[in-house]
Amino acid sequence: MSFQESFSPKAATLLAGIAMGESPRWHDNRLWLSDWGAREILAVDAGGRSEIMLRTPFELPFCIDWLPDGRLLIVAGRENRLVRWEPDGSLVTHADLRGVSDGAWNEIVIDGRGNAYVNGGPGIIALVTADRAVRQVADGIAFPNGMAITPDNRTLIVAESHGKKLTAFDIAADGGLSNRRIWADLVTGVPDGICIDAENAVWYADVPNKQCVRVREGADVLQTVDVDRGCFACMLGGHEKKTLFIVAAEWRGMEKIAEVARARTGQLLTVETVVPGAGWP
């Protein structure tokens, strides 16, 4: 791994007091996120004003992303369902994931064609097509976490947290995944949530190393942002999509997750970047 243009700008706190933030998404000029610890979905504007958009009945994990028609999908991870938030405020089942796996589901990314990729279970990725058909498209992933899709809809990149790498797949016309390959071997990096920018570089959040890192294919490190707590996910947004939003919190292990949620150490941080966000999410 080589290091080029590496520096560590200081992150600013936009919002504090989050129980346990995850799944940040830029939508309708606000940063949306799932607060797993409070079972809420929040939207935060550029001034740090937050609004509870939805109180969910779901236990963690519940990650979010938007269909092209503007409807929100929520991964009800422990219920093995993909849920859709309707304009009237109701929650309806968009897809039943039990036919693929009854293990807990985790992250989601939706491409420009309306295909939803959901991962979790025993290291798998499922595809829910625009017509809501469900099938498995990848397996053998070492703790799948964040996913991103390139602007041309041709490549999906997934974070393998336990594998300490980013893995890429080609996306077929029918949404299937093939040509699996290591996109970046991070060596000591532990990727969680990820996003992609207009230069096809990936930002990944890293909980144990308390940082967000920008890498290009091949694992060259371009930028790092170090903070004082674990970074769970990141998203490029803002007016020009050049603001990196980071959801961070203290991490004391899964056995103390309720304790961490009660302490509300979660923060939404921001860092200004040069290259805008692109692709999905």
Q: Whereabouts are the PLM-identified features?
A:
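A short helix->beta-strand "capping" segment at the edge of beta-propeller domains
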Residues: 1-17, 46-48, 180, 271-274
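Short loop/turn segments immediately following beta-strands, especially the blade-tip
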Residues: 169-176, 273-278
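A short beta-strand motif characteristic of beta-propeller blades
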Residues: 10-15, 49-55, 91-98, 133-139, ...
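Blade/loop signatures of beta-propeller domains
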Residues: 1-9, 29, 37-38, 44, ...
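Beta-rich, blade/repeat-based domains predominating
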Residues: 14-30, 56-76, 98-124, 137-155, ...
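Short loop/turn segments immediately following the C-termini of beta-strands
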Residues: 36, 77-78, 121-122, 161, ...
